[in-house]
Amino acid sequence: MHINDLHSHFEAYPKIKRFFAEHSKTQREVLRFDIGDNVDKSHPLTDVSAGRVNVDLMNDLGIDFATIGNNEGIGLAKAEINQLYHKADFQVILGNLRDKKGRPTWAQPYVIYETKAGTKLALLAYTFPYYWTYGPNGWQVLDAISSLKKDLENPEVAAADFRILLSHLGIRLDEKIARQVPEIDLIIGAHTHHVFEEGEVVNGTYLAAAGRYGDHVGQIDLDFEDHSLTDIAIEAVPTSNLDSEKEDVAFVAHLFEEGEKLLAENLICKLSRQPSLKECADLVMEAMKKSAAADLAIINTGLVVEPFSQNLTKADLHKSLPHQMRLVKFQVTQTELLEICHDIFSQADLLANQQIRGMGFRGKQFGKVVTSGFTYKNGKIVYNNKAIGRKDKMSLVLVDQYYFAPYFNSLTSRKGQLLFPDLLRQTVEKYLRGDL
């Protein structure tokens, strides 16, 4: 059985737990997998525990093996993920992550699992290689297919009867692996939130996937005779089809309320009054500039989901800035800044009311584009109390969503400096506390 891309959406967790428990009551041997992105700090209890509550819940599910997604590998600071699995009752498998000391101590590159009947299953796992972001977080992420081919040369793996890939790589890479690496027998996929309700077959390799947010739970039945596969059945079961129990809503609410309670115990500051949404956006940009030592900033007001409270706690700040994003800094000339502004502002009206998803954004809509350190109007830039020569370099700070999302080609084509480890709300918190 398998789940993936829960992203701290615990709404279906009670159903998944019952499904796992009920389908484990069998004479057949059962393995339970999590294929990554279980953790997402947009949930207050995940945020306050740095993901450790997710591991506790995975333990309660009886997970046997797991791998990581980008929300663990990038969404968590290196120090956080190095602590994440200390109390895990399951093994983490990951074959394409290193640091200067070598492989992470909390993961194995592969596992050879021998069934009661003596059939040897090779379990391998890889996460999507976001090179630009793993590096600043202190990791070296390797090409997944090259790593897979190298691991397949290991005598233990080569001698296995059946090879299963736990893939947080996305559907396109899964299909590519199925075509190029015939040694893999089964790929359990994730990352792109795709669903294979009855599985797929590509070049003789079986593919399974179970969506996102717990909207499906995966079940794969494997039959072996003399250590060779004789039958396979793949299913992704919609959790909406599973029975609810009256305690489910209270359980999910308790997780959220407990997170908010723990965050609320930490007062950040007392403001003279409750600021407006625009004033909050201005404050966020000041924090960004201070943290990044930048001259200029651009954000969208939709980053501030709700205005800051006057007596601002970490719970309030989490509600206002729930996003899983950091800062990116560029060095630009006046001409380059004009190009960037034209690119962003020409799309501003179109994006304003769009419900944005992904790339770390956890708000409702994009909102208006605002600036700090300069104004842009009618294709012209006016700097705040500063004369800028045409060839002078200035530093511009943005949220990294602008860098990774497909909207702004003027940014994606440039080399930016990604700033780790703090998330946006951590940057704002430090600014308000006077710690920058």
Model features per residue range: what roles?
Residues E225-T313, L317-S320, L432-L436:
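A short C-terminal boundary segment appended to hydrolase-like catalytic domains
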Residues S167-H168, T301, L398-Q401:
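Structural motif
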Residues A66, L296, M394-L396:
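Hydrophobic beta-strand segments of well-ordered beta-sheets in folded domains
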Residues W132-P136, Q219, N241-V249, F308-S309, ...:
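A short, polar/proline- and glycine-enriched secondary-structure boundary/capping micro-motif
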Residues M1-T239, L277-D282, A287:
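Acidic, metal/ion-coordinating pockets
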Residues F33-G36, G189-H191, I299-G302, Q355, ...:
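A generic structural motif
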Residues F10-A12, F308-L436:
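Feature captures C-terminal
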Residues F19-E22, N154, E286-S291, I340-Q347, ...:
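Structured segments of extracytoplasmic/periplasmic soluble domains
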